[in-house]
Amino acid sequence: PPYSSRRQRQMCIRDSAHGFPLFACSIGLLRHGKPLLGAIAAPGLNQRYWGCLGLGAWCNDEPLQVSSCQDLADSLLVTGFAYDRCERIDNNYSEFCYFSHRTHGVRRGGAAALDLAFVAAGRLDGYWERGLQPWDLAAGVALVEAAGGLICDYNGQPLELSTGRVVATNGALQPQLLKGLAECQPLPPATYNAEIPAGP
């Protein structure tokens, strides 16, 4: 029905498209703009994550620790694609191709909070993405750092949540992931048979 008629009644809105179980609800606490603690509920997986800097991180009462992977070639990474990927040439396609050929594999889950939680749990070795909002990042960033991982922006600088560009790893892979990101240039849209609208 039209939006005007929907406003007249109660609605339930959910974000579990197609029954895909990788969705989450996350809450982060910031201190002076920096994530201090985070809690992430993943009902589709029956998992609850929480962590606090200096105290540690857990999933369903099991302690979390980032992976011990040392070499990018042995790593399993995760990324995502921003909502405006069809409108920008800086759309992460080049980075996805680059790392797909230089790692054990790259996954795309779709929930930034869970991607970060999986890095904190050592299931994934690293994560990068652009186009994120502070509410996408706050809880997961706290988890990764509480579990012994490293967080920064694409330039290796301390993360400012407002930039929307994050790199998260177990620590050992941080220089390798940053080096790869620096080497990537946007792919010409013709290589993936698309047209990007002209704009800034």
Regions found by a protein language model. Name each.
Residues 1-13:
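Single conserved hydrophobic/aromatic residue that forms the stacking wall/gate
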Residues 65-200:
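An extended, acidic
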